[in-house]
């Protein structure tokens, strides 16, 4: 278990930073390229542990994939060309891989077994396996398909109209991917609109997708045609440096090529509402996945209330938003964020416990947290508990804490941002 020592940053963070490729889009580009007909070239791919797990799984099913840094070539097999894996498909720490891939495996007429690490073994799979079973897939697992390992024998599926109890892009995507070979029109309705990378990329690969309010539909029998994919920077990774730029004194950062998909930009809306000083310069208007350069500098923040429809648009950014709130004047309330409990860790409890160790005044609620600003943080020994977003949040916290901060299990950041600590170091010079 590797640890990192973070010293206070007295001179601020300054400079330009190119944000690594979006994790969600990188996963989908590999998967969709694998089931498309023809060769797909992906540029800007995120070579983090999670996305490499996706490559490994599809290679195991006979797909020819060559990865060289942030460029990947996938020679697609078509929807019917995947081969039965000879070994267990290991997704590592990647919830996206197991949930989306389950939708693809549900419509393949062979047997597969899917598992991941200890964190994946605790994460709820029934939200995906139940609708896939309703479509006709034969899926089993611990506690009737609630937990991994999962066994899947796909086959002839029938379309369903599914009302999802949660706004989850992973649930929605698994059902839509299963629907590609299902008989009829598959429809998914959510309580709030979740991130729409799957819909956008399916359309880029030639699939007709219909969107009506909170409902997404597609007809079975459609084929994917290979296309080249340019992956923008991951706004969830950018969030750590956006908050760092706002709360570390004497800072000014330019974040280049940040993905600006409107289903993901809740962090931008929150920082604006809190009073952060920043500018957004669009760089690829008209692209299926918009991007921008963002300049942010040290700001005076104020506490706000965060809840409702915005939560799915910033669910992964809540740990670092909580950190920002510790440096804001007044009280910040985060609610309607039950989904935090089923991430890599229970992020409500973990954020509260670790920030409390650093001297923050923060308390957990059933569906979020309450943060009392402004708090002077003091260095301490903290732990990511294997959660990449907790690890990065704690690193930024260490930059403003008095004295050194020791982060245990710091290597977890490699899941989504392998060069995070190196980038942080560069910006302090």
UniProtKB/Swiss-Prot annotation:
Keywords: Amino-acid biosynthesis, Aromatic amino acid biosynthesis, Cytoplasm, Transferase. It holds the Pfam family EPSP_synthase. Phosphoenolpyruvate binds at residues 23, 95, 123, 170, 347, 389. Its EC number is 2.5.1.19. It catalyses: 3-phosphoshikimate + phosphoenolpyruvate = 5-O-(1-carboxyvinyl)-3-phosphoshikimate + phosphate. Its main location: cytoplasm. Pathway: Metabolic intermediate biosynthesis; chorismate biosynthesis; chorismate from D-erythrose 4-phosphate and phosphoenolpyruvate: step 6/7. InterPro entries: Enolpyruvate_Tfrase_dom, Enolpyruvate_Tfrase_sf, EPSP_synthase, EPSP_synthase_CS, RNA3'P_cycl/enolpyr_Trfase_a/b. The active site is at residue 316. One of its GO terms (biological process) is aromatic amino acid family biosynthetic process. The keyword Cytoplasm applies. One of its GO terms (molecular function) is 3-phosphoshikimate 1-carboxyvinyltransferase activity. GO terms for cellular component: cytoplasm. It is found in: Cytoplasm. The keyword Amino-acid biosynthesis applies. 3-phosphoshikimate binds at residues 23-24, 28, 168, 170, 316, 343. SUPFAM superfamilies: EPT/RTPC-like. HAMAP family: EPSP_synth. PANTHER family: AROM/DEHYDROQUINATE SYNTHASE, PENTAFUNCTIONAL AROM POLYPEPTIDE. Belongs to the EPSP synthase family. Monomer. Catalyzes the transfer of the enolpyruvyl moiety of phosphoenolpyruvate (PEP) to the 5-hydroxyl of shikimate-3-phosphate (S3P) to produce enolpyruvyl shikimate-3-phosphate and inorganic phosphate. This is 3-phosphoshikimate 1-carboxyvinyltransferase. The lineage of its organism: Bacteria, Bacillati, Bacillota, Bacilli, Bacillales.
